[in-house]
């Protein structure tokens, strides 16, 4: 494994560690160095690992950065069935099933949406996302089902990415949450990686977070639960899950942010429902080539429909 050894300069006192390393190791991006720090690949002159990219430099120390060799992209085309909602020569909209990872990454090098798309599109996907993420403009979590738009050409990718950047994409989710939130409301709270658990996102007030806004409305009150619609003004990682949990209405089945009541726990077990009850139900945007507004809808998958039905039955009893 290649290593880089660097010595800090006096002007870096008070800087964040990731900023200092990025100024010294210019061949690596700051984002890449952030990931290396968080992954335990950076140690100080005493050999102690430093895992916080925001660690403030207090003295002229030396740091060693271990740089893992890149693993070849495992983007082999695979004949995996896809539910294509719309397709033309520029883009396609797919209804992703729960359990499918969007693109290859550590621990998931095949059976991803990208593998399926490479087969379906015969490799004709936008290259802007790089070899690891061809055609991928945005993502949804592995265990979230629903609609994604995929770019087949670079102009389509650029046009879609611009709409995601200016938050003009209309994204609406269906979620089954614990309890009964207000008939409508919104959560405006910045999100960042948790400083305690890097696998989780958290609402933060220390300036690290990116603005995140979720609007929600009640659709159907259920037995100690509710079916709601969430409209995303922004699209941060785990946004709906963290925001709804923060107001006391976590998603049923959510293994990370959930706090299911005993009755819900028993029902989820009986249905073998092992994911967050979240579905990307609506996607609307301006077609990047034609300039026309397009809107797509996808019904909740069978597992969420069954959960909803059982909660409705319980509500009547």
UniProtKB/Swiss-Prot annotation:
EC code(s) of this entry: 5.4.99.23
Keyword Isomerase in record: yes
A molecular function (GO) term: RNA binding
Pfam families, A to Z: PseudoU_synth_2
Keywords, sorted A to Z: Cytoplasm, Isomerase, RNA-binding, rRNA processing
PROSITE patterns per record: PSI_RLU (PS01129), S4 (PS50889)
InterPro entries, A to Z: PsdUridine_synth_cat_dom_sf (IPR020103), PsdUridine_synth_RluA-like_CS (IPR006224), PsdUridine_synth_RluC/D (IPR006225), PsdUridine_synth_RsuA/RluA (IPR006145), RluA_PseudoU_synthase (IPR050188), S4_RNA-bd (IPR002942), S4_RNA-bd_sf (IPR036986)
GO cellular component, one term: cytoplasm
Keyword Isomerase: yes
Subcellular location, record wording: Cytoplasm
Location of the S4 RNA-binding domain: 15-89
Matching NCBIfam families: rluA_subfam
Protein name: Ribosomal large subunit pseudouridine synthase D
């Amino acid at each position: 494994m290649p290593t880089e050894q660097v010595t800090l300069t006096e002007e870096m006192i008070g800087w964040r560690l990731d900023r200092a390393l990025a100024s010294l190791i210019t061949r690596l991006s700051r984002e890449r160095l952030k990931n290396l720090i968080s992954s335990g690949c950076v140690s100080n002159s005493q050999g102690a690992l430093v895992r916080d990219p925001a660690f403030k430099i207090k003295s002229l120390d030396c740091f060693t950065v271990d740089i893992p060799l890149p693993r070849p992209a495992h983007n082999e085309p695979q004949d995996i069935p896809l539910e294509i909602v719309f397709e033309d020569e520029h883009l396609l909209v797919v209804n992703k099933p729960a359990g499918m990872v969007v693109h290859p990454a550590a621990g998931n090098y095949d059976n991803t949406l990208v593998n399926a798309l490479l087969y379906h599109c015969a490799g004709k996907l936008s290259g802007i996302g790089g070899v690891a993420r061809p055609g991928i403009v945005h993502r949804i979590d592995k265990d979230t089902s629903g609609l994604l738009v995929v770019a087949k050409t670079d102009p389509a990718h650029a046009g879609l990415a611009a709409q995601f950047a200016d938050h003009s994409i209309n994204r609406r989710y269906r979620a089954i949450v614990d309890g009964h939130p207000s008939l409508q409301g919104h959560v405006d709270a910045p999100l960042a990686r948790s400083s305690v658990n890097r696998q989780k996102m958290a609402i933060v007030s220390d300036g690290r977070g990116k603005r995140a806004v979720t609007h929600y409305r009640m659709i159907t009150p259920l037995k100690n639960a509710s079916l709601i619609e969430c409209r995303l003004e922004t699209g941060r990682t785990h946004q709906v899950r963290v925001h709804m949990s923060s107001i006391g209405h976590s998603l049923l089945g959510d293994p990370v942010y959930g706090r299911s009541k005993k009755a819900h726990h028993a029902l989820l077990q009986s249905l073998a429902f092992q994911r967050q009850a979240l579905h990307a139900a609506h996607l609307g945007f301006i077609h990047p080539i034609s300039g026309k507004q397009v809107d797509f809808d996808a019904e909740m998958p069978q597992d969420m429909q069954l959960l909803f039905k059982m909660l409705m039955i319980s509500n009547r009893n």
